[in-house]
Amino acid sequence: MFDLNTCLRKNILELQPYRCARDDFSEGVLLDANECAYGSVISVDGVEFNRYPDPRQIEVKQRLCDLRNKELSITKPLTPDNICMGVGSDEIIDSLIRISCIPGKDKILMCPPSYGMYTVSAKINDVEVVKVLLEPDFNLNVDAICETLSKDSAIKVFFACSPGNPTAKALKLEDIKKILEHPTWNGIVVVDEAYIDFSAPDMSALTLVNEYPNLAVCQTLSKSFGLAGIRIGFCLTSKPIATIMNSLKAPYNISEPTSRLALDALSPQSIDKMHTYRDAIIQQRVRLCKELTTIKGMGKIIGGYDANFILIQVLDRPEGGKPSNDAAKYLYLQMATMHKVVVRFRGTEPLCEGALRITVGTEEENTILLKTIKLVLQEYYTKK
């Protein structure tokens, strides 16, 4: 049974957030924040860089809520009070660990193969990482997860990546619910939805945020919106958890240029463009899935079809071969160094022997990719 007051760190619950100048007033003759009154030495599109940005970002949060409430037909609508914003999802991940886990004592649980920053953030915070492998089909092993949570009360956060990275598979909401409803575990379930816009709409855990007080969903503008360069992420969670996370964050963690770009990205016109890009990516994903598996030496797609990338195996022989890390690594390195076509080698991840993670590119990029794979694999098998 989830209890916020015993789940989170006592010192965090007692934290009095820093109150900055812009929490009180943002208009008029502003002589309260020791800013440069004469303005900024640079000027871009009328942005007042000499002023500290809005610490609450209500407009950006509201636009995200409007988008998700409409798309998902959420019965208990999300509001800005459900959101904490961060410098990419990585800041959100770190914040969730810091509010929950006492360094050197508490733990997180994750399910490899998964996003590596969960481990990195945990290690930085001196938090142990407990691992329960995904099933061979990359679904959650719910029984093993629940058993682990039952046995170890030091686990305070469970991280699930959906769609998974590198698996490209969206997790079943029924599995997420079973973990949220664990009868004895007191902790937060985090569902990282960086790639959710490339999957079916009914796969998002956002529909559950106002149903479960122990759920936190991470989203970003980096993927479907094409804004990886501005570094902005969102945690959509219960209002009590969001309040605590907003108390913990740096007072001006989202810059004014980033805020304005995010606001523009969440406008109706930009959302329409996002949908156009997303549809084109999904169309090219279908093409890649079809054509990659016809190339001699390429194995099966072992991941799902819910992201803007594909997880596929490379074989040790052109026909009748087995997944091979040597072949996959050769293909990866030769393409990158000799042909300037860069993918990611993922063969050292659990359940990913001989696997490459390939981002879905434009039609032209994918044509180059397919030709390059054929060429390099021919070279590899000829040399063997």
From Swiss-Prot:
Metabolic or biological pathway, per its Swiss-Prot or TrEMBL entry: Amino-acid biosynthesis; L-histidine biosynthesis; L-histidine from 5-phospho-alpha-D-ribose 1-diphosphate: step 7/9
Cited InterPro entries: Aminotrans_II_pyridoxalP_BS, Aminotransferase_I/II_large, HisP_aminotrans, PyrdxlP-dep_Trfase, PyrdxlP-dep_Trfase_major, PyrdxlP-dep_Trfase_small
Cofactors required: pyridoxal 5'-phosphate
Naturally occurring in which organism (per UniProt): Schizosaccharomyces pombe (strain 972 / ATCC 24843)
Modified residues (N6-(pyridoxal phosphate)lysine): K223
Protein name stated in the entry: Histidinol-phosphate aminotransferase
Organism classification: Eukaryota, Fungi, Dikarya, Ascomycota, Taphrinomycotina
Gene Ontology CC terms, in alphabetical order: cytosol; nucleus
Annotated EC: 2.6.1.9
Domain of life the protein comes from: Eukaryota
GO MF annotation list: histidinol-phosphate transaminase activity; pyridoxal phosphate binding
Catalytic reactions of this protein: L-histidinol phosphate + 2-oxoglutarate = 3-(imidazol-4-yl)-2-oxopropyl phosphate + L-glutamate
Pfam family, one: Aminotran_1_2
Gene name of the record: his3
Family: Belongs to the class-II pyridoxal-phosphate-dependent aminotransferase family.
Alphabetical keyword list: Amino-acid biosynthesis, Aminotransferase, Histidine biosynthesis, Pyridoxal phosphate, Transferase
